[in-house]
Curated annotation (Swiss-Prot):
Cited function: Binds to the 23S rRNA.
Species of origin: Lactococcus lactis subsp. cremoris (strain MG1363)
One GO term (biological process): translation
Protein name: Large ribosomal subunit protein bL9
UniProt cross-references to Gene3D superfamilies, sorted A to Z: Ribosomal protein L9, C-terminal domain (3.10.430.100), Ribosomal protein L9, N-terminal domain (3.40.5.10)
GO molecular function, one term: rRNA binding
Amino acid sequence: MKVVFLEDVKGQGKKGQIKEVPTGYAQNFLIKKNLAKVATAAALSEVKGQAKAKEKEEAEFLAEAKALKEVLEKDETVVEIKMKVGQTGHTFGAVDKADIAKALKSQFGLKLDKRKIQLINKIQALGTKDVPVKLHRDVTAVVKVKISEA
């Protein structure tokens, strides 16, 4: 019996997948627990419509990520963070992902999740540093962060 999976079923199929399964398994387990439904013409067209909508949404998200990458990589887009510095030139504290995200929002109005900023170690020195930002699985931007004396 052909069924369309409504949920992921371990060892059988993923949501939206169309698969041939034994009739008893389909009727007694999958359909009863609303994990799948019989693959009728209406169900198949619904799955195709959902796939198209998901593909369109993914394309829009990718386009937004590319546009944001262009904004972040402009020459005038430099995130400036001021820190207190001691007499020897060492900074008090360090700049982390949250500080960079907060500065991006306050200086440029760009709301960016701190988890997308790929800063391995906190920045503890004065100067300019390039920090990668993963906007999408295919799009990574590099933002310039300038640490200066307050």
